[in-house]
Amino acid sequence: MSVLVIAVATESGVPIFSRKRGNSENIQFSTIASLHGINMFSKCHNLLMVNTQVDNGNILWKEYSKSVTLIGVATGGLECDLELLLSTVHNLMIFSIGKKELDSFKNIDQIKRDLRQCYPILDYLLESLDPEAVLSPHPTLVLDLIQSILCPQAQQLQQALDNYSESLTGRWACLSIHGRLVATSSDFGELDPREARLLLLLAATQDGAPLRETPVYLPQISPNVAFRAVTCKLLADVYILVVCGATPALSQIDEIVLQCWEGFAQVIKDAKVAYPRNFPMSISFEPCVLGILLVNTNNQRCVFSRHLHATNQKSRGMPGAHKVDILRTFYVTAARELAREHKSRGGEKDELEELDGMCEVTWVSEYHKCHARRAGNLLCCALYSSSVPSHTMRLITNQMLQDISTNKEIHW
């Protein structure tokens, strides 16, 4: 598989950047010019070039604010929502340099230099789409969800985050373990899920830096005025991020971190034990369940696990990368519709209105089965071995939803 993202200036066609992941060859300037030329030719004839199919893949063009055109190319059978990927990349560009600067394009060379700061996040984002990168620490799933860990310590950590944020006169704090969201401050829900994902990505790409500050523009709340995001490494693979003003200085923040978090070292270590299972041990899963994706539709958070059982149990012969790929493909192509709210607009019949009453969907193949069911704000997508009867599969999914929704150790 391979995925490629190209950014060009809409009017001049000057390449801004190109980033790729996978086994595709490096993109040549002539190829970039040809791809952009196709889009410009269509515009000259009042046509909209949406996407096109190529051998074992597709290409998508998206123009933003008449200043930048993003081109996405996915090949090798990768199930990737290119439109969502390009939208995320555009938000990342705003996140890095601000909407006003991106829309004006006064100095392309300067913009190209400024956008280099977003390359680590962009590369991280592209690598996270690769199901073969099972040894990578990057969370691997879908672009419209915030991958999380559910652990009993979340409420204690939320109180600590509130205290830490208040000490810095900041807002919107979160704690991540292995790049997955574990706990947030009380006001974190004010952020648009797209902004929350970008902040989590920023924390996940710190490369071990103990303390770092980064100017960020929140695409929905403040696209033109920068905030200051301060990221601190507490333990190995454990980071806290808070959005605050110009003060206090980093040297003072170092002291505040010690004061606020010194007493929570054991709590954080206990929370780390939940990884890579990502669910409390009080929740048990049937041996025939090979993997699970749990989605909270209220806050766009999800929990994914392919390590549901003890390590001494048999793995049923399915590689971990294959489980990831199956569950993601199942969610993107079928189960995602269960997570959406379909509302008719202005009395007109929505084209997806017939899905309003649907609460489950099933996939059956020769080697595995997938079943998804929604109950309230929770959507459970489960991967089963092919020998499990369909009626048993439905009963198990329903029981998992009930166990998860009533478990008192789960705090979103």
Residues covered by each model-derived region:
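Intrinsically disordered, Ser/Thr-rich regulatory regions of eukaryotic membrane-trafficking proteins
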Residues: 1-412
